[in-house]
Every structure is written in structure tokens, then in C-alpha cells.
Amino acid sequence: MNLSSASSTEEKAVTTVLWGCELSQERRTWTFRPQLEGKQSCRLLLHTICLGEKAKEEMHRVEILPPANQEDKKMQPVTIASLQASVLPMVSMVGVQLSPPVTFQLRAGSGPVFLSGQERYEASDLTWEEEEEEEGEEEEEEEEDDEDEDADISLEEQSPVKQVKRLVPQKQASVAKKKKLEKEEEEIRASVRDKSPVKKAKATARAKKPGFKK
């Protein structure tokens, strides 16, 4: 039996869900698995283990079984509570945090025995591998950004040189064109002077002057 009740704190990004189960003669084992799905890290905080009102006057022993895929086959179950109705009907568990999956077993006694606690989910906690993957992705993004910035800087440094190189031939062409125009203007002026009637008249007068006799 799971008691579902959720609460969250924004500061720590933690969600807690009430949890409980019953061990008895009919069901001697119970495996805890997270109720919420996702990449949140989950812990089971075990609070109390107590006998039911119908429990017999006998010793009830509750233990945690080792994981089924445990490599070390020599690992033994761990007893967490020994209860008896007239002596110790309930125990409080302080600071007990378990990682799922966790299997509880009623080793001795007929029950019922009730276990209660909280499921604690921390959305901000990541596994070591996930943290490494995220750090690797961030480093790759930073390297790509640095490469882009270097490429932009190199383009900015090269572009003024290219502009200067382009301006030099343009300047030389304008100087050559100017000289050509000046030369053409001089030729035009010379041809105009040669064709002037005043200059021709002076030339003929000078040619006839030596021909007069006294």
C-alpha cells in the first residue's frame, strides 16, 4: 500500500512522496521502486516500523535482502527491526536512506508489520556520468565559440589589407589616365596653334622680306 502525498521546495528542488507497505503471512516481501519517473535521483527515507493491532505475541523480524544482481553472493540479509507486541511494538528509524530498488522481508513472525517513510526526489542531482557528459558538451560548445571568434578576427584583420591592395592599382590607373589626358590636351593645343591664321601670316611676311631690292 502506497500513500501518495507530494510536497516540493523550490530552493532545493526537492520533491517528497509518502510511502508505506505491509508485510504479513500472505505477503512476506516487498520491493520498493520509485513512483515518479525521470532522471531524478531517488532515496527512500525509512521512518517507522510497527506491528499491527492483530499481530500475535511472537517475535517479528524484518530485514533487507541484498540486490538480486549482487556480484558478491556471500552478502547476507540485514536485519533492521525485531518487534514483539508486549515488549517493542514499534521502532523509529533515524537517518536511514536507501537507494532503490530495496526489498524488505518479514523473516520471522506472521505480522502484520507496517513500514512507513518518504520517497525523496532531487531533480537537480545528476549522476557522475551525466555530469561528465554535460561538462564535455559545455567544453565542446566553448571550443566551437572560440574557433568562430578566431575566424571572425582573422577575417577582420585580412579585409583591410585586401582593401589597401585594391586601392593601389586604382590609384595607379587614375594617375596614368590623368597623364594621358594632359598629353592629349597638349597635342590639341599644339595643333590649334599650328592652324592659327595669325601665325601663318607672320610666317609669310618673314619669308617675303628678303626679296625687296633698293
UniProtKB/Swiss-Prot annotation:
Composition skew (Acidic residues), residue ranges: 127-155
Quaternary structure and partners: Homopentamer, when bound to H2A-H2B dimers only. Homodecamer of two stacked pentamers, when bound to H2A-H2B dimers and H3-H4 tetramers simultaneously.
The gene coding this protein: NPM2
Protein's name according to its UniProt entry: Nucleoplasmin-2
Organism: Homo sapiens
SUPFAM superfamilies assigned to the protein according to its UniProt record, in alphabetical order: Nucleoplasmin-like core domain
Motif Bipartite nuclear localization signal, chain ranges: 165-180
Residue span of region Disordered: 119-214
Localization terms from the record: Nucleus
Residue ranges, annotated region (Acidic tract A2): 129-152
